[in-house]
Amino acid sequence: MADPKVDLWATDEVHFQQYGSRCLMWVPPEETDPVLLHHPTRKSVGYFGAVRLRDGKLAFHRESERFNAVTFHTFLKYLRQASSRSGRRVVVITDNARYHHAKLHADWRSQQAPQFVLDFLPPYSPDLNPIERLWKLTRRLCLHNRYFPTLEDVVESVESKFSEWTSGNEVVRKLCAIN
């Protein structure tokens, strides 16, 4: 049974590329050789994201720089602030990226304990992180079979979907449920 005094969050980083992915799609039978537009670039936008597993609430932060200890620390402080209103203990599930263990934010994490702690997944096991399913759904709903002339179009598409999930969502809750 879930502890009502603990909020469990799953967190991860993700990149969404401007170069769209093509999946199954319907093409009228009279078009024998359809032309599919795509932008010849590998530009991408990165996000830190966290899902509260009890209600499917999404917290996200667009990252303009690379993911590193400084940007992760900034996101942890953002997540701490977003989750502090509940008064519950916060446990954050995260992977073993090197910068998640950085000394830069180790002191801050020890000051926040036991109210805010990181729980690391086993090495090389991203499939155990519930938020990975949300990234897959986001790609399917926002990026598959679509043409984005600019990177800002990708940002707009992704963030419009994310904004629907910031107050909690039953679909996200069920998708990220741990059985």
Residue ranges, per PLM feature:
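Extended, low-complexity cationic-aromatic segments
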Residues: 1-77
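RNase H-like two-metal-ion nuclease catalytic core shared by retroviral integrases
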Residues: 94-96, 103, 119-141, 151-154
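A generic structural signal for alpha->beta connector loops
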Residues: 5, 89, 115-118
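Acidic beta-strand-to-loop metal/phosphate-binding motif
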Residues: 10, 89-95
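Short, basic/hydrophobic alpha-helical segments
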Residues: 71-91
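C-terminal anion-handling pockets and recognition modules
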Residues: 4-8, 131-179
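Short, glycine/acidic-enriched loop or turn micro-motifs at the edges of active sites
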Residues: 15, 98-99
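RNase H-like polynucleotidyl transferase catalytic core
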Residues: 33-41, 110-130, 147
